[in-house]
């Protein structure tokens, strides 16, 4: 009797153990799925933040160069934008771009001395300020491909050398072009020529 009861309890223990292991595996699988989904969302947010930073750096314009740099950095390659040194603005350029300042500086010396003698207590003149301020020049990136240059045709063929569309065409005003005698063979003309040719006897018949 005791052995039979032990045999009945033994399969029930294995069944409970089986369902327990199955539940544990399902819990572990669900936890892994939730973790991978959370990690995927986290990476998506990081990529979106990086894209926002790239767009802000590119001043909201699509830049193939920035896209190329980001692509290289993703694969572990170092890349940077080489803009080169900024061009320095020379004095001659400022003088050419601000001609009003030159007109203000061209003051006769005698007039200035006379004004100082007449007004000894006059205040010192304020330094001249240019009316226009030069904006910082940005270096322009030159493309490696040359720009296409389209040249016009130096001359066009005269209308006289072109065949007329009509007898009185607009292309020939006032009949300036010479008339051309073109022989057009019609069926009637060919029939008349054939008749005249048959009417003449051959020399052998004579």
From Swiss-Prot:
Against InterPro entries, the record matches this protein to: TEX38
Protein name from the UniProt record = Testis-expressed protein 38
What does the UniProt entry say about where the protein is found? Membrane
Q: Where are the transmembrane segments?
A: 15-35
Q: Which UniProt keywords apply?
A: Membrane, Transmembrane, Transmembrane helix
Originating species: Homo sapiens (Human)
Q: Which residues belong to the signal peptide in this entry?
A: none
Q: Name one GO cellular component term.
A: membrane
Taxonomic placement: Eukaryota, Metazoa, Chordata, Craniata, Vertebrata
Q: How does it sit in the membrane?
A: Single-pass membrane protein
* Highest taxon of source: Eukaryota
